[in-house]
């Protein structure tokens, strides 16, 4: 008997500044605690991807973003659900960032990614973007 897993649509912002990318660390109480990811979150019913990105980045970092083109998509199965992760090239419209709904945030060069434990879906996206996976 096959059971279908719930599909969760997630969007994330790829924000680059001076060759470094903004990543956030999940809170200790979150699903996949303390793992790193590109900033973003779930798309709510009735929202566009751009609206969800603006809402999620504001909620997590207190920052406004301009959502650009879709640059990557991966579908990653977890035990009880599947994450469809859409990565968008975005532009930060705010200079100041605050760790509001994240444990921490960092600007990393792509060569530093392997020094941080990322969520499986984000890791698959990074591998696809960097041509590693």
Q: Whereabouts are the PLM-identified features?
A:
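Conserved N-terminal beta-strand and adjoining loop/helix that marks the start
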Residues: 1-22, 42
């Amino acid at each position: 008997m096959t059971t279908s897993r719930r599909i969760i649509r997630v969007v994330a912002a790829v924000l680059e500044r001076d060759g470094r990318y903004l990543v956030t660390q999940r809170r200790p109480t979150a699903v996949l605690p303390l793992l790193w990811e590109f900033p973003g979150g779930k798309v709510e019913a009735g929202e566009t991807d751009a609206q969800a990105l603006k809402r999620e980045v504001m909620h997590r970092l207190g920052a406004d973003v301009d959502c650009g083109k879709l640059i990557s998509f991966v579908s990653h199965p977890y035990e009880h659900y599947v994450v469809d992760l859409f990565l968008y090239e975005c532009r930060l419209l705010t200079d100041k960032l605050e760790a509001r709904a994240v444990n921490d945030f960092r600007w990393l060069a792509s060569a530093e990614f392997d020094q941080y434990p990322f969520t499986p879906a984000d890791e698959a996206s990074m591998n696809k973007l960097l041509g590693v996976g």
